[in-house]
Amino acid sequence: MYVTHIDTEKHMHTQHKAVKEVELINTLPLSQSYFKGSRNTPLTNNTIGAYFDFIVDKNPNSLAVVVNHQNIRLTYKEFQKEVNQLAMGLLAIGVKPGDRVGIWSPNNIQWCLTQFATAKIGAIMVCINPAYRPNELQYALNSVECSTLITASQFKGSNYIDMLNSLAPELKHCDNGKLSAQALPSLKM
């Protein structure tokens, strides 16, 4: 994997030099997942969930989320309430820290809630491309071993429920939390 970085202040006056810098950096392999160096803002040891709660405490009545196409506007306190409800629901159906929770959905409030709810409980949110067809969905879910899938019912002419049922007909007859689908062996909920 390679990384591209341009120090814009350093190379603002000399575009040609900046291009050479990018070419040079593109030839260097990425060898660190963490880059250590001085920063204006120090790193925090908080989790996303803990930091979110901290922000909510500081700004409970400030606007946090606007989803125009769903006509939704939530303050931080309202958004936190919804996030906590989803987090508790995920825990209640058996999602544990480290579990992979897939979301197969376009950008919407449910996607935002899932992002923060999974972070709060220590689950790993797996974003599934909303344009995926059944074979691509099967590959994605099986590759990362998703145990849970949250999905929209449909989007832009794609009926996600029908596609899931075609891939795993067992969905129609399973009990909640007890899915056993041959095509999706790790999916349980």
Task: List where the protein language model places each region.
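Structural core segment of the AMP-binding/adenylate-forming
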Residues: 2-19, 121-189
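Flexible, non-catalytic linker and terminal segments flanking ANL/adenylate-forming cores
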Residues: 1-46
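Hydrophobic alpha-helical segments typical of transmembrane helices
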Residues: 47, 51-52, 136
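Short, flexible loop segments at the rims of nucleotide/cofactor-binding pockets, characterized by
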Residues: 40-43, 78, 126-129
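AMP-dependent adenylate-forming
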Residues: 26-32, 51-75
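Aromatic/hydrophobic pocket-lining residues that form π-stacking "cages" and hydrophobic walls in ligand
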Residues: 52, 114, 164
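A generic structural signal for well-ordered alpha-helical segments
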Residues: 55-56, 118, 141
